[in-house]
Amino acid sequence: MQFERFKLVDRILEINTAERTIRCEAIVPTESSILDHHFPGHPLMPGVLMLESMAQTSGWMILGVQGFRKMPFLAAAREAKFRTFVEPGTKLEMSAKMVHDGSGFALTQAQGTHDGKVVCDATITFRVVDFPKPEFKQQMLKFAEELHFPMQMVAND
């Protein structure tokens, strides 16, 4: 993870467009100015960043299902739960499943686990729209390659 770049997923482990699922790896940095202040002397990953990591994981899955034709933007998060503390250096496995896709919206169930135990989960809604600018899509494709996104899923429109 790179908090300062707002990159909260390190690597895509598996994406299955038929089942509309994804698994990603996210390693909490051992050093970050954010962790220096959350909390001083007892650094913990902020819950809002756990939620963002679940949202980014879901977003990559939606991009795969859409073949990078449309971009998901976070619209709502419901029933977000943070079940335990997440410390610097923790390796998280983030996962998501799309449970609805239609009318310009997608809904996912997402969670983060560590050593097989759920540390966070949420129901997340996205507005799914055309990319606002071609440059933005190109930047997202560049990020996708960095994360080992299976580029064969990108539609050749």
Residue ranges, per PLM feature:
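Short aromatic-glycine motifs in intrinsically disordered, low-complexity regions
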Residues: M1-F3, G67
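Catalytic strand-loop segment that frames the active site of acyl-thioester-processing enzymes
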Residues: E4-M45
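Compact, glycine-rich, soluble single-domain proteins
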Residues: F39-P46, L51-G59, L74-A75
